[in-house]
Every structure is written in structure tokens, then in C-alpha cells.
From Swiss-Prot:
Name assigned to this protein: Nucleoporin NUP42
Keywords from the UniProt entry: Glycoprotein, Membrane, Metal-binding, mRNA transport, Nuclear pore complex, Nucleus, Phosphoprotein, Protein transport, Repeat, Translocation, Transport, Zinc, Zinc-finger
InterPro entries: Nucleoporin_NUP42 (IPR051767), Znf-CCCH_4 (IPR041367), Znf_CCCH (IPR000571)
SMART domains the UniProt entry points to: ZnF_C3H1
FG repeat ranges per the UniProt record: 14-15, 95-96, 218-219, 220-221, 265-266, 271-272, 288-289, 290-291, 311-312, 336-337, 345-346, 364-365
Modifications made to the protein after synthesis: O-glycosylated.
Protein topology in the membrane: Peripheral membrane protein
Location of the protein in the cell: Nucleus, Nuclear pore complex; Nucleus membrane
GO biological process, one term: nucleocytoplasmic transport
Free-text domain note: The FG repeats are interaction sites for karyopherins (importins, exportins) and form probably an affinity gradient, guiding the transport proteins unidirectionally with their cargo through the NPC.
């Protein structure tokens, strides 16, 4: 044992508790052999003999123990100290539950299970009375498996399937399937609100061990597996009206169109829609206008008609033909050219021209491009789409255009006349 240099200098502040040898001090054995208490006032920095920092055995740091954040006097006690906040943790046994649900539980474990079940019942009551989205999964504890019997379906998935059934004129099957899912949710909520012995055992088993959750129904190429009679909302076969009928089976990522309409990125259906007869990327109808498409073919970014539309068609977005073309079509000139039959990136008209093109049947123009980029043609090409003649404006609209600034509530919705523009 090394000799304490501070003891030799007469200023060792640890006394008999010093780890080094104090020669001539009560047997010269150092402080560890005969730990005796000293008056608490003999050290200059407030260290007393009751401190465990320099005890015979090195004490581990208090942070090395996996103590719960909530603070518990019994460190080996499973607990649900933060269950109400949704962030419960445990350190020894899963959720404070015994491995055998039928085994006798300690009072602490029984208290934790009772608190868990009461929280589930309360959550079900709030879920039912609050009007929250019912097609969702549920877990009483954060970062733990979901309780079986619930289906996770987003509003967008419901909307997509609604439009798919709308195009097939089979809304009754859609309504029947949704109603079955609603009834299934209500039955499961009622089961969890009024728990019996068998339901409690199954519920505690779900919370502790978890159940094999089904894969999401809305997946690329995924098949739906039922979990506690939950079909996962899927609508594929319109001939059947049960809840198992819903399914988002996909064969292609970005391709879908109804019969007779071209698809945007391929001919295989994207979300269970019927296969298309023509494709946006094909030899007969170039998708982006690199080539000379036929007059009857469709540009892939055209919003002219249901049969000549790719983005906004019933196949891609699930919208019916009447909804796909109504809000999008507007009397504006194409941005990158457009003729009387095919549009480039806008809504074509019979006399629509732009500053970069002349009337042409191509998407980006053909041989007329050599004469369409002049400054004179860009001025001449302007028509009534961009400007409003004076005779078509009311007196109030004309006054607003002639004034220095608009009046709130009287701003015209029409373009101004060309004569009033100062360039």
C-alpha cells in the first residue's frame, strides 16, 4: 500500500478512511482496515464520515441503475407511473404482467393490470363519444403492439375506393362494405367497454405479447391478411358486397385508366382499375410530344376530354369523367404550344396560340417552330384569351381598369383590354 503523502504533510483530510497508508496511525494500516467515525467538523470542505463516496466498497453511480423516470421507492417494482400520459415504461416485466395470465399476481401487478384495463375502457368511451375517425388502430401504451380488432384506413383510401366504385356504377357494394366495417368497429368498441373474464385475458395477452398485425392494405403488391376479422378496407371485386371485397392490389405504380382512355405511365392498372387500351408512353401516341402523334391520340398532360386525358382521368386519380375534366379545363393558352387537336401542357382551343408557337397538331410544334419564335409573331399571336375587348366590359369594369388602383369589392374578374396596358 502506498504511503499517503498528504498524511506525511499533516493535511490528509480523509483520516482513517484514506485509501493510502498512514504510518504510525493506529497500527499503520491505513483508513480501510479500521474505519472509525470522526467528528464531522474535522474536514475543511464539508466531507463527513457518513459520505459513501470514499467508503470501503466503490459505490456505483446512481445513474447506472435503470430507475424509472417517474421515481419509485421500490426499484424492482413494475409500474405504470406514466400510463395516463401514454408513455409507460417498464424495466423488469412486460407492463407489470406475469407471464402466465392465470397465475396468481402480486398486489402491485394486479393494481397495474386494473389501471391498464380502466384506461382502455375510458379510451373506448372517449373514442365513441368524441366522433373521432373510427377506422384507426389503437394501443393503450406507447410504442407497443396495437390491440387486435381495429382496421387502419385513411380518408384518402376511402375516397379513392369511392371513385373507383363510382366509375363502375356499383356504389351499393361500396356502401355495404363501409357499413360492415362500421359495425365491426362498434362491436369491438362495445367488447372493450364491457370487459368479461375471457376478454380481459385476451386483452392482457395482446398488450403483453402483441399479436401478429396484418400488413397495411394499401400497399404496392401487398395482399391483405385479416386480423381479428378486420379486412383492412379493400375494394376490388365489385360483384361482391362484403367487407372482404375491399383491396388495393396493384400491378403497376403509376398506371391506371378505364377502358378506352390512355394511361399515364403504362397500361397495367394501378389501383385495381380496369386495364387501359392505350398507353401514354407508346409508339402510336408519344407521351411528351417527341414525335408526331396522330390526331386522335392524347397528349399525356392534356385536360381536354375524358378520353384524351391522362392526369385527371378516371383511371389515375379515381375520378369519374365528369369530375376529371370540369374543374381543370380553363380557357387559357398552352404554355409550350398547342394546336387545334392536341395540347402540350394546357387546355387547347380551336384558336389558341402562344408566344412560342403557331397552330400545329404536334405537342411542341413541328416545322412551324422555325417561324414561331419571332418577336413579331409573339405580339400578333395574342388573342381574346389574354385580353378583353372594350365592348365586352361593363362600365364599372372599364372604370376600374382606367383608375389608378382597384376598389375593394369591385375588382374585375376579366382580363383588361390591350389598349389599357402600358408596357
Amino acid at each position: 500500500m502506498a504511503i499517503c503523502q498528504f498524511f506525511l504533510q499533516g493535511r490528509c483530510r480523509f483520516g482513517d478512511r484514506c485509501w493510502n497508508e498512514h504510518p504510525g496511525a493506529r497500527g499503520a494500516g491505513g483508513g480501510r482496515q479500521q474505519p472509525q467515525q470522526q467528528p464531522s467538523g474535522n474536514n475543511r470542505r464539508g466531507w463527513n464520515t457518513t459520505s459513501q463516496r470514499y467508503s470501503n466498497v466503490i459505490q456505483p453511480s446512481s445513474f447506472s441503475k435503470s430507475t424509472p423516470w417517474g421515481g419509485s421507492r421500490d426499484q424492482e417494482k413494475p409500474y405504470f407511473s406514466s400510463f395516463d400520459s401514454g408513455a409507460s415504461t417498464n424495466r423488469k416485466e412486460g407492463f407489470g404482467l406475469s407471464e402466465n395470465p392465470f397465475a396468481s399476481l402480486s398486489p402491485d401487478e394486479q393494481k397495474d393490470e386494473k389501471k391498464l384495463l380502466e384506461g382502455i375502457v375510458k379510451d373506448m368511451e372517449v373514442w365513441e363519444s368524441s366522433g373521432q375517425w373510427m377506422f384507426s388502430v389503437y394501443s393503450p401504451v406507447k410504442k407497443k403492439p396495437n390491440i387486435s380488432g381495429f382496421t387502419d384506413i385513411s380518408p384518402e383510401e376511402l375516397r379513392l375506393e369511392y371513385h373507383n366504385f363510382l366509375t363502375s356504377n356499383n356504389l351499393q357494394s361500396y356502401l355495404n362494405s363501409v357499413q360492415r366495417l362500421i359495425n365491426q368497429w362498434r362491436n369491438r368498441v362495445n367488447e372493450l367497454k364491457s370487459l368479461n373474464i375471457s376478454t380481459k385475458v385476451a386483452l392482457l395477452s395482446d398488450v403483453k405479447d402483441g399479436v401478429n398485425q396484418a400488413a397495411p392494405a394499401f400497399g404496392f403488391g401487398s395482399s391483405q391478411a385479416a386480423t381479428f376479422m378486420s379486412p383492412g378496407f379493400p375494394v376490388n371485386n365489385s360483384s361482391s358486397d362484403n367487407a372482404q371485397n375491399f383491396s388495393f392490389k396493384t400491378n403497376s405504380g403509376f398506371a391506371a385508366a378505364s377502358s378506352g382512355s390512355p394511361a399515364g405511365f403504362g397500361s397495367s392498372p394501378a389501383f385495381g382499375a380496369a386495364a387501359s387500351t392505350s398507353s401514354g408512353i407508346s409508339t402510336s401516341a408519344p407521351a411528351f410530344g417527341f414525335g408526331k402523334p396522330e390526331v386522335t391520340s392524347a397528349a399525356s398532360f392534356s385536360f381536354k376530354s375524358p378520353a384524351a386525358s391522362s392526369f385527371g382521368s378516371p383511371g389515375f386519380s379515381g375520378l369519374p369523367a365528369s369530375l376529371a375534366t370540369g374543374p381543370v379545363r380553363a380557357p387559357v393558352a398552352p404554355a409550350f404550344g398547342g394546336g387545334s387537336s392536341v395540347a402540350g401542357f394546357g387546355s387547347p382551343g380551336s384558336h389558341s396560340h402562344t408566344a412560342f408557337s403557331k397552330p400545329s397538331s404536334d405537342t411542341f410544334g413541328n416545322s412551324s417552330i422555325s417561324t414561331s419564335l419571332s418577336a413579331s409573331s409573339s405580339i400578333i399571336a395574342t388573342d381574346n384569351v389574354l385580353f378583353t375587348p372594350r365592348d365586352k366590359l361593363t362600365v364599372e369594369e372599364l372604370e376600374q381598369f382606367q383608375s389608378k388602383k382597384f376598389t375593394l369589392g369591385k375588382i374585375p374578374l376579366k382580363p383588361p383590354p390591350l389598349e389599357l396596358l402600358n408596357v
